[in-house]
Regions:
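Contiguous, glycine/small-aliphatic-enriched amphipathic segments in soluble metabolic enzymes
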Residues: 1-135
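Flexible loop/hinge segments that line or gate small-molecule binding clefts
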Residues: 130-152
Length: 152
């Protein structure tokens, strides 16, 4: 019996930014969406956000009715809304790489990147890419890149 397509992986983006708030709001509209999960630190979610920590993306669909499925990726230090922390840079980059690996393995059907703070990544980890698109191309071993935006 098929369990349906793999869920979509959401990267947390910059914890001090709007990414975790977007993910929390998306959970409230979950009936309109295919299964998804957030990769990040559940401590960074807005206060009161229902969530379920999952060990693997295969648990996302079952967790989704009860709370935002979060594949735990612990960060050092606290989230300070509006104040990007260069100390979080390596963990943010690792979340993106983890999402790519899960997508390439088939554990996630796609990935959606939430906003990063490019200067914090450069200052904190020497991030050598102009943004997500070029880093994703690098991880996928591609030279040519295209960015797609969807506004609903």
């Amino acid at each position: 019996m098929s369990q349906g397509p793999a869920p979509i992986a959401l990267t947390c983006g910059e914890p001090a930014g709007v990414g975790v708030e977007i993910a929390a709001k998306l959970w409230h509209r979950r009936a309109e969406c295919p299964p998804f999960f957030l990769i990040g630190d559940p401590r960074h979610l807005p206060a009161g956000t229902p969530h379920r920590v999952i060990a693997h993306p295969t648990e996302a669909a079952a967790a989704l009715p009860h709370g935002l499925p979060v594949l735990d990726h612990p960060f050092d230090g606290a989230r300070v809304p509006g104040l990007p922390q260069p100390a979080h840079a390596a963990q943010i980059i690792a979340v993106i790489a983890r999402a790519v690996a899960l997508t390439q393995s088939g554990a996630a059907s796609a990935l959606c990147t939430l906003p990063i703070h490019k200067k914090a990544l450069k200052d904190g980890a020497g991030f050598a890419f102009p943004g997500h698109t070029e880093y994703l191309a690098h991880l996928a071993g591609q030279r040519d890149v295209v960015m797609m935006l969807h506004l609903a």
